[in-house]
Amino acid sequence: MPGTLFLIVGPSGVGKDTLLEGARDRLATSRWFSFPQRVVTRAADAGGEDYIPVTPSEFEQQLAAGAFWHQWHAHGLSYGIPMQVARDLDNGINVVLNASRNEIGAFRDKATHVVTIGISAPPGIVEERLHERGRESEEEIKRRLARLVEQAPLTGYALEIVNDRTIEEGITALVDLIAGACDLNAEITRFPVTIGSKQVCLVHKGNQIASRVLAGSSRVTLSLRGKSVSAELGETWSDEIVSQDLCALSEGAMAALDAVEGDVVSIERSPTPKSRSILQKKVRGGELSHAEMEAFIHDLVNGRFSTSEIAGFLVAASNNLTMDEVISLTQVRAAFAHRHDWGKAIVVDKHSMGGVPGNRITPIIIPILAAFGLTVPKTSSRAITSAAGTADMMEVLSRVDLSPDEMKSVVEQTNGCIAWNGNLTHSPVDDVMNAINRPLGLQSTLLDVSSIMSKKLAAGSTHVLIDMPVGPKAKTRTQGEAGALKNLFESVGQGIGLNTKVQISDGTKPIGRGVGPVLEALDVLSVLRGEAGAPTDLLDKSIGYAATILEWSGAVSQGQGAQVTRDLVSSGKAFEKLFEIRDAQGRQHDPLQPGQFTEDICADRSGRVEAIDIQGISEVARLSGAPKDKAAGVVLNVQVGDQIAEKQPLLRVHSSSLRGIEEAVCAAQAQSAFKIL
């Protein structure tokens, strides 16, 4: 951003030179200000301003050599402005220039940003000052006073100082006008701190521009090479942290700007969000239009709301969004994520509401569908409260942190992928909202559905099948809740043009044997290899869901899906496709080895397994170290309905550390997850 050209104008005797000299003493120590000397055909001992004296012939020589950016003639003298002024302005330096009011128009034609400051004083004070300096005769003083009275007031972008008080007060007034009219630029230095999810900008309290243009502001907008980010504003007197011409930015702010130390950033006070009235409308219970939702989310993502304002919106929206608002929020969230377009009439996806240990059907369904020939770009999350998410499990086989271009390449090669959504369909809206609602513990199906469906929309899907386990300890507790949530998903899907089908399933018990990334991967491979001991519940559920998708999407006739799906598994084509996807994403070469520390949890009595507490199983698996410890978790040795003997192993705990085993076993023994009658 170019610097500002300040033209200081005023007749003789008003104290212009004195004020300029004082302002220079206060500002010129900053790299962002320049007070160039004029070249004047005036004798060196003439007094007054600080100038470069030359003879008329010397002036003409410099003019011919191109030494002047601008020059003019007045009162029998020639004035030249050095070419360095143009270079300074181009480099963002603010130039303060002693100018003639007759040349204001010419300067405005040459510079991008020009501010004129007129210095004036009452005639009586001017006459007194002219007599005191003794440079003019009585006749000259009379002529100057006459011109002073005749001069028209300055117009157009002009500021004025009436210099009728003390010298210090006049200098302060001039510095205030100059510094307050500048754009604030600062060289970046790194501020090695992290304060939650907040970005931070720290400036020196002695920064003359910052102290004026940012006065009263607590947030600023930082801009660099077309990128911008909002940040919390901090101030310090410590030169060790940041000097007067620099700003210290937090790691997050630098990352958002793609900045390095030494870059020059533009700093502005963050404006009051235009959408604040929209926020207030929602908090009062009003309904937002699509345009209002779009404007609000835009300001939200750009950091223009405080934490308390965001919390206010989330509390209001958590239980008070109309269907149209949920649809609008979903569309706007997707617009902030990377949008994928596969150029296919049918692009299928499957999503699970989670909460059931194991249940790793996605890495089985995706290769089945891809082997058939459907396009299935699956993006999945990591675990938040469970022992493993689909991305955690897939990561033991291959890379999952794909870029959009890498994902496109994998899908073009194999028809499918199983990747982490953080780089692909995750919206920055989620980051802002999650940073507030997770600590608050806000539970909202309206916001959850909006988030889930926005990712499916961003992924370019046309058909989405949602697995909704229902059980007293699952995320969806009752059939009534499931019915309402099913209607919400399908209505939002219809509103955003996405074919959506919800399949309600049993959420009362684990699916499969392993719980934890490596242990679940071993189950998946066992099913796809067609091994005799593969978990039948995991196989049957995967076959059922894959068949539903094939029939629902029109890929096969009704009633044919199950047989087609089983053939793809038994022939080994689905297994081969999983390994194709694995290799295309980037194969992990570490062996699938469960944690070497193990301990069995055994039955304290004989009887029949009546129930298995899914939350209890998840807790034990997480205490063992999963999902961060990929090899940790539990293996279930029995299922609901099995007859067992006393001392029979119910599950085996795995961990890569002795501490993980101790904590998991302690929890398992304190409260058994198995109900045996």
Curated annotation (Swiss-Prot):
GO CC terms in record: cytosol
Entries under Pfam families matching the protein: Glycos_trans_3N, Glycos_transf_3, Guanylate_kin, PYNP_C
Annotated region described as Thymidinephosphorylase, given as residue ranges: 188-677
InterPro entries noted in UniProt: GK/Ca_channel_bsu (IPR008145), Glycosyl_Trfase_fam3 (IPR000312), Glycosyl_Trfase_fam3_N_dom (IPR017459), Glycosyl_Trfase_fam3_N_dom_sf (IPR036320), Guanylate_kin-like_dom (IPR008144), Nuc_phospho_transferase (IPR035902), P-loop_NTPase (IPR027417), PhnN (IPR012699)
Renumbered residue ranges of the record's region Ribose 1,5-bisphosphokinase: 1-187
The entry's keywords: Alkylphosphonate uptake, ATP-binding, Glycosyltransferase, Multifunctional enzyme, Nucleotide-binding, Transferase
Keyword 4Fe-4S in record: no
Involved pathway(s): Metabolic intermediate biosynthesis; 5-phospho-alpha-D-ribose 1-diphosphate biosynthesis; 5-phospho-alpha-D-ribose 1-diphosphate from D-ribose 5-phosphate (route II): step 3/3
TM helices/strands, residue ranges: none
EC number from the UniProt entry: 2.7.4.23, 2.4.2.4
GO molecular function: 1,4-alpha-oligoglucan phosphorylase activity; ATP binding; ribose 1,5-bisphosphate phosphokinase activity; thymidine phosphorylase activity
SUPFAM superfamilies from the UniProt entry: Nucleoside phosphorylase/phosphoribosyltransferase catalytic domain (SSF52418), Nucleoside phosphorylase/phosphoribosyltransferase N-terminal domain (SSF47648), P-loop containing nucleoside triphosphate hydrolases (SSF52540), Pyrimidine nucleoside phosphorylase C-terminal domain (SSF54680)
GO biological process, any: 5-phosphoribose 1-diphosphate biosynthetic process
Described function: Catalyzes the phosphorylation of ribose 1,5-bisphosphate to 5-phospho-D-ribosyl alpha-1-diphosphate (PRPP).
Protein name according to UniProt: Bifunctional ribose 1,5-bisphosphokinase-thymidine phosphorylase
Species name: Roseobacter denitrificans (strain ATCC 33942 / OCh 114)
Gene field: phnN
